[in-house]
Design a protein with these regions (language model features):
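C-terminal beta-sandwich/jelly-roll accessory domains of carbohydrate-active enzymes
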Residues: 199-253
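Active-site beta-loop-alpha junctions enriched in small/polar residues
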Residues: 18-20, 48-50, 225
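Single conserved hydrophobic/aromatic residue that forms the stacking wall/gate
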Residues: 2-13
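Alpha-helix-loop-beta-strand connector modules within alpha/beta enzyme cores
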Residues: 32-45
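Structural recognition of the beta-strand scaffold that forms the well-ordered cores
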Residues: 14, 43-45, 194-196
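Glycan-recognition and catalytic regions of carbohydrate-active enzymes
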Residues: 147-194, 198, 230-234
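Glycan-recognition surfaces
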Residues: 42-149
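Active-site-adjacent beta->alpha loops and helix N-cap segments on the catalytic face
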Residues: 22-32
Length: 253
């Protein structure tokens, strides 16, 4: 590693397939964090147990997996794993422990009943906008784009939106939620607010209270499920609208 540092090679250490939480592996995680801190390297532990506060000792540890991330869709059928319901459960449970490396961002999306586990061309359960919203909902200081580069080149509008979402936040406001049913969160970075909302397989409307914005005029760049999203999950619509003066926003998912 000394040779790599002298050449200026690499700033992020992503360690995969730890797959254990016995004492030996816990010791390894602590030692790896210490060594990476010495060499001023950031760390993302993938395939590891949930966080337990290590990032407070070693702030260079940005992220942990410790979650059934989107990669599960490569080998799990809809019957075997209901990812859509899982996504509106983990913000209330797993995310309490700390950040999670969920590896989202699928551009191939499948409506209910249409998902297939295809290892070479994996797809997500649920809509395209669902994938976008997870970048706001899920706490993750070091985010990923899980899909193939060719898919992102084809989907430039969504890719540009994802790439502009911050990964660290100055303020977080819980807007609505019920475990395993729906969740809506607003997060602020600087002067900009980002709002994400997810539902389970049940279509629903939410009335969001945006009074936290305070006075002034705001413009909302909105990505929402398209009219056919329940059948064609990639269907979405982008709008740019003024935030209502009464600070009430109705969304349909």
């Amino acid at each position: 590693r000394d040779r790599s540092v002298s050449r200026g090679l690499g700033d992020v250490y992503k360690r995969q397939f730890l797959d254990r939480d016995d004492q030996e592996m816990v010791n390894f995680v602590y030692k790896a964090s210490e060594v990476c801190a010495k060499y001023k390297m950031l760390v993302d532990f993938h395939g590891v147990f949930k966080p337990t506060g290590l990032q407070r000792t070693y702030p260079n540890v940005l992220n942990y997996e410790g979650v059934n991330g989107l990669e599960q869709m490569k080998w799990s059928s809809e019957k075997e794993f209901d990812m859509v319901t899982y996504d509106v459960t983990i913000p209330f449970i797993r995310m309490i422990a700390g950040p999670m490396d969920y590896t989202q961002g699928a551009m191939r999306n499948a409506a209910r009943g249409n998902h297939r586990s295809v290892n070479s061309e994996p797809m997500s359960q649920g809509t395209r906008c669902r994938q976008l919203a997870t970048y706001v909902i899920f706490e993750s200081p070091f985010n990923m784009l899980c899909d193939a580069p060719s898919n992102y080149r084809r989907e430039k509008e969504c890719t540009e939106f994802i790439s502009n979402i911050p990964t660290i936040w100055d303020e977080t406001v819980s807007l609505a939620g019920k475990v395993s049913e729906y969740v809506a969160i607003a997060r602020r970075h600087g002067n900009d607010w980002y709002i994400g909302a997810l539902t389970n397989w049940t279509p629903r409307e939410l009335d969001l209270d945006l009074s936290f914005l305070g006075e002034g005029d705001y413009t909302l760049e909105l990505f929402k499920d398209g009219i056919n999203a329940d059948r064609a999950a990639r269907d979405y619509k982008k709008e740019v609208i003024p935030v209502p003066t009464d600070r009430k926003l109705k969304i349909h998912m």
